């Protein structure tokens, strides 16, 4: 959206500066996200009461009634019209000018004009069957580009509002993805991350015959959510095509469903040297009874098998995950099963969330809601476990050689360092004094000396790669 506005002549300023137009890309994944979205919108109006405040994104989709009644929001745009933001703004501003002119003429003629009412204009929040194409040329980061490959989700986990906010699965045409990544490579980006709402579903909405002809034609299928992931996954097909793009040296993939990892997909991924051995496999719970209530589509044992397959074909891959504690009905025994499972798998990183109700979801009306103090206790236990497992994973690299893509400069303990990540996303630091070139977006090799901080390892450089 920022890119489109700049191309139309708008000047982008930091959010805390006074602006004529404020655009807040809202989130609704949790109640906290809702609240933060509202706070940002209200801050904008307080900063400049005369400014046009625009809400776009998921909160607009799920909270239409609240959005329409919020006096701080002037214009609300649904997810499927983000690509039209610039033209919508221009049309809206033209309408305002016309209304002001009419009001001025009326006042000059001695007629009163009622300006006390507030109306929020809501632009199309209905979901579409097609992917909303928005191609990026550059991103805020200078070394890593995030490439969106699909939108929507068909899973309908019992705690999640995202399918209602983002709609059904819509996959982006492979041709558009390849073109965007090629452009990013030409602009100097060396690493890309494939993102989406549910990227394991990439391509399930494509017409099979069209795909065989090399075309990506999106179609609606009644049984989309029942289609299984297999070794012929369109996601793996896409990875293989991206792998051939010159200039891209690292490919990362976003969150995956465990069942997409089969023997065949694991082998195909391992055959791609550019693919980073860094996999986020969504878990949520290590207890099968809890997983069933969550409407997750796998068992804990199936999850463990997926991890084993990745560890079989990749050398020491980084496995990360999400875990929800305090889901409705989670007993002490069920939580203990999750603790045991997490200890068995051993992750690089875990994102721990305390369950919170989302209006309109099945979980919100389930019986046996877990008290907040219990959630807090369970969360603290898993956070302590996460810290220990993460340290153990990083310790593996001490004394070993590693390759890092330098990204930014930061001062730590009075010393200036260049920071970057390994292929499996371990953060390393090299002293600027030792790095004579002092250039971000440079790949260097070195030996890991030890821990600089709890989360950053210190690298002694051996050579610059390129």
Regions found by a protein language model. Give the residues of each.
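Proteins enriched for Cys/Gly/acidic motifs involved in redox and nucleic-acid/cofactor modification
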Residues: 1-202, 209, 216, 234, ...
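Conserved SAM/AdoMet-binding glycine-rich loop
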Residues: 53-54, 62, 186-332
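OB-fold and OB-like beta-barrel modules that bind single-stranded nucleic acids
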Residues: 85, 279-281, 350, 406, ...
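Conserved, mostly hydrophobic/aromatic
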Residues: 157, 177, 194, 253, ...
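Contiguous mid-protein beta-loop-alpha structural module that forms a pocket-lining wall or clamp
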Residues: 330, 345-347
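Aromatic/acidic polysaccharide-binding cleft in carbohydrate-active enzymes
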Residues: 354-368
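Terminal RNA-binding accessory module
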Residues: 365-466
């Amino acid at each position: 959206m920022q890119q489109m506005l700049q191309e139309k002549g708008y000047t982008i300023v930091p959010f805390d500066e006074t602006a004529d137009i404020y655009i807040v890309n809202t989130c609704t994944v949790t109640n906290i996200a809702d609240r933060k979205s509202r706070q940002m919108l209200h801050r904008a109006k307080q900063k400049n009461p005369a400014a046009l405040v625009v809400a776009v994104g998921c909160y607009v989709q799920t909270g239409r009634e609240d959005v329409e009644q919020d006096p701080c929001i002037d214009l609300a745009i649904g997810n499927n019209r983000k690509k039209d933001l610039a033209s919508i703004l221009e049309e809206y501003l033209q309408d305002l000018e016309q209304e002001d002119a009419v009001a001025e003429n009326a006042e000059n003629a001695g007629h009163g004009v009622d300006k006390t009412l507030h109306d929020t204009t809501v632009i199309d929040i209905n979901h579409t069957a097609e992917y909303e194409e928005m191609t990026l040329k550059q991103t805020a980061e200078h070394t890593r580009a995030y490439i969106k490959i699909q939108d929507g989700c068909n899973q309908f986990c019992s705690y999640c509002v995202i399918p209602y906010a983002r709609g059904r699965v819509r996959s982006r045409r492979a041709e558009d993805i390849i073109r965007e990544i090629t452009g990013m490579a030409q602009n100097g980006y060396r690493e890309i991350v494939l993102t989406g709402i549910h990227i394991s579903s990439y391509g399930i909405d494509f017409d099979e015959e069209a795909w065989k002809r090399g075309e990506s034609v999106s179609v609606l299928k009644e049984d989309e959510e029942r289609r299984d992931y297999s070794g012929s996954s369109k996601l793996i097909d896409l990875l293989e095509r991206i792998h051939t793009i010159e200039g891209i040296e690292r490919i990362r993939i976003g969150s995956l469903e465990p069942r997409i990892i089969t023997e065949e997909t694991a082998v195909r991924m391992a055959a791609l040297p550019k693919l980073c051995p860094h996999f986020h496999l969504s878990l949520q719970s290590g207890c099968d009874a809890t997983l069933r209530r969550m409407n997750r589509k796998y068992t804990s044992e199936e999850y463990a098998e997926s991890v084993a397959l990745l560890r079989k074909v990749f050398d020491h891959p980084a496995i990360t995950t999400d875990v929800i504690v305090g889901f409705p009905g989670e007993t002490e025994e069920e939580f203990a099963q999750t603790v045991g499972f997490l200890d068995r798998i051993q992750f690089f990183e875990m994102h721990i969330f305390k369950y919170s109700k989302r209006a309109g979801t099945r979980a919100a009306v389930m019986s046996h809601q877990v008290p907040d103090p219990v959630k807090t206790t369970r969360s603290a236990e898993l956070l302590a476990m996460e810290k220990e497992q993460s340290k153990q994973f990083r310790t593996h690299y001490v004394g070993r050689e590693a390759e890092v893509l330098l990204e930014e400069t930061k001062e730590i303990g009075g010393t200036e360092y260049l920071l970057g990540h390994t292929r499996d996303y371990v953060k390393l630091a090299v002293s600027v004094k030792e790095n004579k070139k002092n250039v971000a977006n440079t790949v260097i090799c070195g030996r890991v000396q030890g821990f600089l901080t709890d989360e950053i390892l210190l690298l002694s450089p051996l050579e610059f790669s390129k």
